[in-house]
Amino acid sequence: MVKEFDQDPQADVWILLDAQASVHYSRPDDIVIPPADRFWLWKNRYEFSLPTDTFEYSVSVAASIASYFLRQGLAVGMMSYGQMSIALPAERGERQQTKILENLAFLKSEGELPMLGLVESQYSHIPRGSIVVMVTPSNHETIALAADALHLRRMKPVIVLIDGVSFGSENGVEYLSLTLTERQFPVSVVKKGMDLRQALERGFIEEPARSQVVN
């Protein structure tokens, strides 16, 4: 996927994070990372273990992607809809990194809006030519429709799928991954226990913020 960014190194990067409650899975008895601690760990790029929770993985992936591209000097924006709506315009610099990490740290997977709804409600605010990274554990076919919608509007969709089966859920993403690949969209699949740095290296970034490992 790195070629997607090499083609236009000045393109804005937009991260769309799926915070719809019904698509996420967590193990109730696992550890919980307080929001303030999560922000501090991300900001200082410390390694830490993630719980068995697809949303924790999703926000950590989003944080790693945002931090990486901001360090490369690109403008990064973010959109999500959990217990609150987040719509951060694409900007550069450390201040933008702080805003993104703060919002991610306190975001909860309590939303009702699916990824397709997020895309349809927000793509008018995203400039053509932008790279749009969708981070989701959903295996619904509407993810492919969301990618199609972005592509038709001359944006460059990239999809990071969090594989729920590896967390104990019944919702695997293998079929959706194949569908997206057949449509020639860049896809990265993240599973529980993966080092996020390695998982994303196989996708589209070469050196994200030092990633979290779950044993």
Give short role names for the model-derived ranges.
Residues 1-215:
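Exposed, interaction-prone extracellular/peripheral surfaces
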